[in-house]
UniProtKB/Swiss-Prot annotation:
GO terms for biological process: tRNA methylation; tRNA wobble uridine modification. It comes from the Bacteria. HAMAP family: MnmG_GidA (MF_00129). This is tRNA uridine 5-carboxymethylaminomethyl modification enzyme MnmG. Keywords: Cytoplasm, FAD, Flavoprotein, NAD, tRNA processing. Belongs to the MnmG family. Homodimer. Heterotetramer of two MnmE and two MnmG subunits. GO terms for molecular function: flavin adenine dinucleotide binding. NCBIfam families: mnmG_gidA. It is found in: Cytoplasm. It comes from Streptococcus agalactiae serotype V (strain ATCC BAA-611 / 2603 V/R).
Length: 633
């Protein structure tokens, strides 16, 4: 079929949420002529739900995005109103940064970045059709019948695909925040042969700040100690006049109001058909599932420095408006609250992610990539991480270069993508530290050491940043070597100083590195005894040193496990293997293999329902095929 294309691009990204922004910036920065099409230019990088970035596991993802050369970390470091390190009382594997964002400023600043980016065209357009010829993407068609050619297309439509907002008994076609839904494109994806699922998510009401009695709530301030998402941000730029959040709770009256109106709740009346998020349930769902709990936490989160809107985190609901007002006013501090926006639920179509490769390219159509909530995930950070990987791989495909696959041992982004393409998801997928078996080596403090080299090799990390990274890496390695070479002896003067600090005296000579393995001994304490490095160390290097030294034994065990799994990951499975040709594997395993088509032995081993015996048989089969080829040659 001959198309009359209005314009030609290397890559077209459909949707300008958090996934679309990262995908388009990555592709254009890698030298590809890129079009970013969105239904509404005013909603670029918009936050339709919580006004925050980061949190448990998610904060590590933002650091990973930054280390690879993505934008989210830099953007939130310019636009936050509060910064807080979570889980500081726990081990380093689960620590993560979280920022309250100035919602409007975040979107505005990201839009400016996109508008200034070379090779990137931003256009308001509804994409209705992905144009495909001979199983390959060739372009897109808009609702106004304009056609644009592309060698790769990335779909990042968020919750807009056949979106429907639900509020009480009201249900109507809409994307998030009453934007347009993308219905024709949803039909087109089905017609192209993609399996489609249906998910649901929700958002809480927003209340007017001046109507809140904060004296009845508990203040939740940010951190005084500087912290940043981007490895390029400087401590001297840390914002000190931060805006606090506030803590309050539901109570028995709140629960009574909900219970008395469950018949009007779409969650229970049968109006909601989509599957909702397990880890972010609606308040009505929480009251029913945890009926024994007398109260639930609610955080009052300002949506910006210059707005009255306050997000009531923990009160996601699709109850009717009148019930929402009564519910809000039953809560301590909100007795006179003015509701500025109602909470609502939204149902939307997703592309079932078992149809994707680890590059986020669909197996059905060459050159078609999907990312973000389109793939069944929840959260801005999960979306941005996928968008970055999809954009990178779309560009690499266009350029004829080797693809980028992040392994589970490389990044939380790799864990997420592997979970999606290997196991699929039956509900909106959220990243958790418990999903990562190698979480001790996937920490927030070492994201640059893990990923910046990759970002540099693919062209997303520039020379200036790479030089800063290499200097930090050299500082770390040199200081580690120095600490391992200096001996502390159990002489009386040394032990006296150690005891004065409240620590146990030495009984044997040990290196400064061994001394730092003691739980109470920080780098600052150790250098009191052995002196400092020749040049002052970056605070990020000091944090990395302390973690790597104190957890060295555990880290080594994790790296040994990674090495074993690497051997499995290196055993590739041919793309067009006939699974019926393999004798003796269990029926369930055969069915799963046919559905998912794993690309490596390692991926095959992680499919639920596949047991070690099936993997052993598959390994023997693959080795037999390889020997057969050698004999033929």
């Amino acid at each position: 079929m001959t198309h009359n294309f209005a314009e030609n691009y290397d890559i077209i990204v459909v949707g300008a949420g958090h996934a679309g922004v990262e995908a388009s910036l990555a592709a254009s920065r890698m030298g590809c002529k890129t079009l970013l099409a969105t239904i509404n230019l005013e909603m670029l990088a918009f936050m339709p739900c919580n006004p925050s970035i980061g949190g448990s596991a998610k904060g590590i993802v933002v650091r990973e995005i930054d280390a690879l050369g993505g934008e989210m970390g830099k953007n939130i470091d310019k636009t936050y109103i509060q910064m807080k390190m979570l889980n500081t009382g726990k081990g380093p594997a689960v620590r993560a940064l979280r920022a309250q964002a100035d919602k409007a400023l975040y979107a505005q600043t990201m839009k400016q970045t996109v508008e200034k980016q070379e090779n990137l065209t931003l256009r308001q357009a509804m994409i209705d059709e992905i144009l495909v010829e001979d199983g390959k993407v060739v372009g897109v068609r808009t609702a106004t019948n304009q056609k644009f050619s592309a060698k790769s297309v990335v779909i990042t439509t968020g919750t807009a695909l056949r979106g429907e907002i639900i509020l009480g008994d009201l249900k109507y076609s809409s994307g998030p925040n009453n934007s347009l839904a993308s219905v024709t494109l949803a039909d087109n994806l089905r017609d192209l042969g993609l399996e489609i699922g249906r998910f649901k998510t929700g958002t809480p009401p927003r209340v007017k700040a001046s109507s809140i009695n904060y004296e009845k709530t508990e203040i939740q301030p940010g951190d005084e100690q500087p912290n940043h998402f981007s490895f390029m941000s400087r401590d001297e730029d840390y914002i000190t006049d931060q805006v606090p959040c506030w803590l309050t709770y539901t109570n028995t009256l709140s629960h009574d109001i909900i219970n008395q109106n469950l018949h009007r709740a779409p969650m229970f009346s049968g109006i909601v058909k989509g599957v909702g998020p397990r880890y972010c349930p609606s308040i009505e769902d929480k009251i029913v599932r945890f009926a024994d709990k007398e109260r639930h936490q609610l955080f009052l989160e300002p949506e910006g420095r210059y707005t009255e809107e306050v997000y009531v985190q923990g009160l996601s609901t699709s109850l009717p408006e009148d019930v929402q007002v009564d519910l809000l006013r039953s809560i301590k501090g909100l007795e006179n609250a003015e509701m500025m926006r109602t909470g609502y639920a939204i149902e939307y179509d997703i592309v079932l992610p078992h149809q994707l490769r680890a590059t986020l390219e669909t197996k059905v159509i060459a050159g078609l990539f999907t990312a973000g909530q389109t793939n069944g995930t929840s959260g801005y950070e999960e979306a941005a991480g996928q968008g970055l990987v999809a954009g990178i791989n779309a560009a690499l495909k266009v350029q004829g270069k080797p693809e980028l696959i992040l392994k589970r041992s490389d990044a939380y982004i790799g864990v997420m993508i592997d979970d999606l393409v290997t196991k699929g998801t039956l509900e909106p997928y959220r990243l958790l530290t418990s999903r990562a078996e190698y979480r001790l080596i996937l920490r927030h403090d070492n994201a640059d050491m893990r990923l910046t080299e990759i970002g540099y090799e693919i062209g997303l990390v520039d020379e200036e940043r790479y030089a800063i990274f290499k200097k930090r890496q050299m500082q770390f390695e040199n200081e580690l070597e120095r600490l391992d070479s200096i001996k502390l002896k159990p002489v009386s003067e040394t032990n006296k100083r150690i005891q004065e600090l409240g620590f146990k005296p030495l009984t044997d000579a040990l290196t400064a590195k061994e001394f730092m393995r003691r739980p109470q001994i920080t780098y600052a304490v150790a250098t009191d005894f052995v002196g400092c490095a020749d040049e002052p160390l970056d605070s990020k290097v000091i944090e990395l040193l302390e973690t790597e030294i104190k957890y060295e034994g555990y880290i080594k065990k994790a790296l040994d496990q990674v090495a074993k799994m690497k051997r499995m990951e290196e055993k590739r499975i041919p793309p067009h293997i006939d699974w019926d040709d393999i004798d003796s594997i269990a029926t369930e395993a055969r069915q799963k293999f046919k559905k998912i088509n794993p690309e490596t032995l390692g991926q095959a081993s992680r499919i639920s329902g596949v047991n070690p015996a099936d993997i052993s048989i598959l390994m023997v089969y693959l080795e037999g095929r390889q020997k057969g080829r050698k004999n033929i040659n």
